[in-house]
């Protein structure tokens, strides 16, 4: 098709609206204990349509025109709740961190298409036979929930011990295997601190 035909007969429209936001709050219960909460969201919607005029050079099925509409929705929501305790007893320092998090992703999509209209250039899904129409829709949901913790201890900044662990549950895995745990243990010795005493 020549450029003038495309400009006047073939129309495409596309629109996207997006919203993102974050919220966080922290409370100091004491000088050694605090709690925090964070939430974030990312959401957008995309809608587009496409018209092809009758009599163009497109395939035979579209000689009487084609019209399509597509809509896509996306939403991602995350939350994080944490608490931290930091205390010292004599030469020993202790730190305990516990938390939980969620990640929730959802999508929706709808698609409608009609072609070879009964009345050329009248763009309506009702203007095509069932054989010349196609409607489809889909939806998906994914959720990840986790709990985690870390314990740290040291003696005179010389001996250090760290124990941590996290367990996640994923909705995309088979029911019997949705939970998975990964622990970690580490330690260290800074012998040079002994010479500072």
Where are the language model's segments positioned?
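Feature captures outer-membrane beta-barrel proteins of Gram-negative bacteria and organelles
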Residues: 118, 181-189
């Amino acid at each position: 098709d020549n450029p003038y035909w495309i400009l006047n007969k073939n129309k495409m429209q596309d629109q996207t609206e997006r919203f993102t936001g974050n919220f966080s709050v922290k409370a100091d219960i004491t000088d050694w204990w605090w709690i925090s909460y964070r939430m974030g969201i990312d959401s957008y919607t995309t809608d587009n349509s496409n018209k092809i005029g009758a009599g163009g050079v497109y395939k035979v099925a579209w000689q009487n025109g084609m019209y399509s509409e597509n809509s896509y929705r996306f939403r991602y929501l995350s939350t994080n709740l944490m608490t931290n305790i930091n205390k010292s007893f004599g030469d020993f320092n202790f730190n305990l961190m516990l938390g939980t998090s969620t990640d929730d992703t959802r999508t929706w999509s709808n698609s409608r298409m009609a072609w070879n209209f009964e009345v050329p250039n009248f763009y309506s899904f009702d203007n095509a036979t069932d054989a010349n129409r196609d409607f489809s829709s889909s939806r998906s949901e994914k959720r990840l929930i986790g709990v985690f913790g870390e314990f740290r201890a040291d003696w005179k900044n010389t001996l250090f011990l760290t124990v941590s662990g996290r367990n996640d549950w994923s909705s995309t895995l088979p029911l019997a295997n949705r939970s998975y745990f990964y622990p970690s243990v580490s330690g260290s010795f800074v012998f040079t601190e002994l010479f500072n005493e």
